[in-house]
Amino acid sequence: MLSKQISNLNSSSNKPKILSLFSGCGGLDLGFHQAGCETVWANDFSHWACESFRKNIGDVIVEGDIEQINPNDPTIPDCDIILGGFPCQDFSMIWKQPGLEGERGNLYKSFLRFVNAKKPKVFVAENVKGLLTANKKKAIQQIITDFENCGYYVQANVYNFAEFGVPQFRERVLIVGVRLDTGFDFRHPEPTHNETGENGLKPYVTAGQAISNIPQNASNNELLKISDKTRRMLELIPEGGNFTDIPKDHPLYVKGMISHVYRRMHRNEPSKTIIAAGGGGTWGYHFPEPRAFTNRERARLQSFPDDFEFVGSTTEVRRQIGNAVPPQGVVELAKSILPIFSDNYEKVDLHEKLVEEKEILFHDRLSKIRGGKQ
């Protein structure tokens, strides 16, 4: 039934229309496009991310500060879905967590403004797992409450994208809001992959599988320069290891280094999380070759197809890839939302469901969020 709905969407001009915010290079959009949707308007502040989006997703992106854009501007079309990964650095668990008090923490309010103005049937917001604990859990409570007050039934869930076919352990929170009057009983999808391939699931896609057979003429596949010292360090780190595997008595060992630097891939496992920020030690490293991943390898680990060409310098492209939502990771989520656009579903009273939900202590509501693999 669902595959028929997707086919019907793809064969018509009535594809669900996406309004995309904090779009980056377009990873989240691409995943929804692969499920049968299309983006009609998008926004991002980064020039080069906009150029990559324009080249691969479509010439519908507006470059500029979202806080200066009025969602009621007549040039912004109506939509069925609003997507966005509002900036996550202030919620990240890798760095300090200022949360809503950080410089970028309140940008979710721009997302909220668009949802309140456009009233799409559904919205999807992506963020780091640290959002769930930021400001002593007050941040996620405030965010969910604000969207509920706009007339949405909101459900958050932690996704480990390796469990959805991405060759990378990457945990992110996906917040889905369904407009109350739709009566659509949305459920977050169940994983499609696991470590063993048992219980009817597929085995994880491994890093070795993902980065094999890259054509020599593939775009964004330039080797990154590393120092001789870094190369010597990498030769001391085993497959799947990191800086802490360097012998403590070795001259290249530095006391106090943290384990997420100089991480080398394990060919038979998904890669560790691909990130955007940080120095060379956080780039992610090949095995058996003692070198950093190329940007095309990073893109494959983020599940981007080879014909997705990133625009900008090597450093800029690395940032775009690390900031992106892996497209494959949200395809099942997009598919689970599609029935809302067919009206071919059994409706529930979301107003009543929301009243019942609000009677539960927020701490208990949070405890229902499924956690991913550490």
UniProtKB/Swiss-Prot annotation:
Entries under PROSITE patterns matching the protein: C5_MTASE_1 (PS00094), SAM_MT_C5 (PS51679)
Keywords: DNA-binding, Methyltransferase, Restriction system, S-adenosyl-L-methionine, Transferase
Top EC group: transferase
Catalytic reaction(s) noted: a 2'-deoxycytidine in DNA + S-adenosyl-L-methionine = a 5-methyl-2'-deoxycytidine in DNA + S-adenosyl-L-homocysteine + H(+)
GO terms classed as biological process: DNA restriction-modification system; methylation; negative regulation of gene expression via chromosomal CpG island methylation
CDD domains noted in UniProt: Cyt_C5_DNA_methylase
GO molecular function: DNA (cytosine-5-)-methyltransferase activity; DNA binding
Domain SAM-dependent MTase C5-type: 16-344
Protein origin, superkingdom: Bacteria
The protein's Enzyme Commission number: 2.1.1.37
Active site location: 88
Pfam families, sorted: DNA_methylase
Family designation: Belongs to the class I-like SAM-binding methyltransferase superfamily. C5-methyltransferase family.
Protein name as catalogued: Type II methyltransferase M.NgoFVII
Species name: Neisseria gonorrhoeae
